[in-house]
């Protein structure tokens, strides 16, 4: 819930292109979380890779104005972006731990399909937790009325339904299936390809040119992510 809340607020701050760039923080955070909770090794190359990743993000979001360098994105959005990456990284490791405990409780004579469906069960649990959490937030902020108004917006509900299907259902379920069969860090690294995959459709839909600086920054960031688990 924390990661999604931060991610959607970062989208409001500076759009999905930069929001997904900050999500590349998830693999390093997943590595650190695995080190803390699972006792996985953190070598000096891992810290170097983290520095490269952060350098790539900084290169993308900063712009030179005269003799000074300034951040071209709002601070609030940056903080939400960092929170989104942290939430995704920590959540992925905790999900892996939960799936492992769940797998241990399955009887040996259970059908293999039960194991295959575990990621979808995990997604269902995460969705319920998110529903409860966001409902509490909306009630505390007295914004439930806006939710009911949004339900009558046919275009908005159409996009929301498609987003729910491809995001929480397909995307999250496959991500949990990935961590079920491989290390959380490796799975998170592959999922960090989103900033590259989103460049072309984002530029077409929003009719915005992608600057060389943004492209170079994205490449540097993904290089750092790859270094984190491949060196």
Stretches with model-predicted labels:
Residues 7-8, 19, 34, 92-96, ...:
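Interfacial helix-capping/hinge residues at the ends of transmembrane alpha-helices
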Residues 26, 84-88, 163-168, 194:
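Alpha-helical transmembrane segments of multi-pass membrane transport proteins
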Residues 28-86, 90, 96, 203, ...:
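Juxtamembrane helix-loop boundary signature in multi-pass membrane transporters
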Residues 88-108:
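Membrane-helix interface motif
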């Amino acid at each position: 819930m924390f990661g999604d809340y931060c991610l959607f607020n970062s989208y409001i701050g500076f759009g999905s292109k930069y929001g997904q760039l900050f999500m590349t923080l998830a693999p390093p955070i997943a590595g650190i979380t695995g080190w803390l909770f699972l006792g996985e090794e953190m070598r000096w190359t891992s810290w170097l890779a983290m520095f490269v990743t952060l350098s790539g993000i900084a290169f993308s979001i900063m712009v030179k104005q005269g003799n000074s360098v300034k951040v071209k994105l709002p601070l609030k959005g940056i903080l939400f972006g960092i929170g989104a990456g942290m939430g995704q990284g920590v959540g992925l490791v905790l999900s892996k731990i939960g799936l492992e405990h769940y797998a241990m409780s399955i009887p040996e004579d259970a059908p293999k399909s039960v194991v295959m469906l575990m990621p979808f069960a995990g997604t269902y649990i995460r969705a319920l937790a998110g529903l409860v959490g966001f409902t509490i937030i909306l009630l505390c902020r007295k914004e439930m009325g806006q939710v009911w108004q949004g339900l009558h917006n046919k275009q908005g509900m159409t996009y929301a339904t498609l987003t729910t299907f491809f995001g929480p259902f397909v995307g999250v379920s496959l991500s949990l299936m990935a961590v079920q069969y491989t290390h959380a860090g490796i799975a998170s690294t592959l999922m960090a390809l989103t900033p590259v995959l989103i460049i072309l459709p984002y530029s077409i839909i929003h009719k915005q040119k992608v600057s060389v600086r943004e492209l170079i920054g994205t490449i540097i960031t993904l290089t750092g992510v790859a270094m984190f688990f491949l060196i």
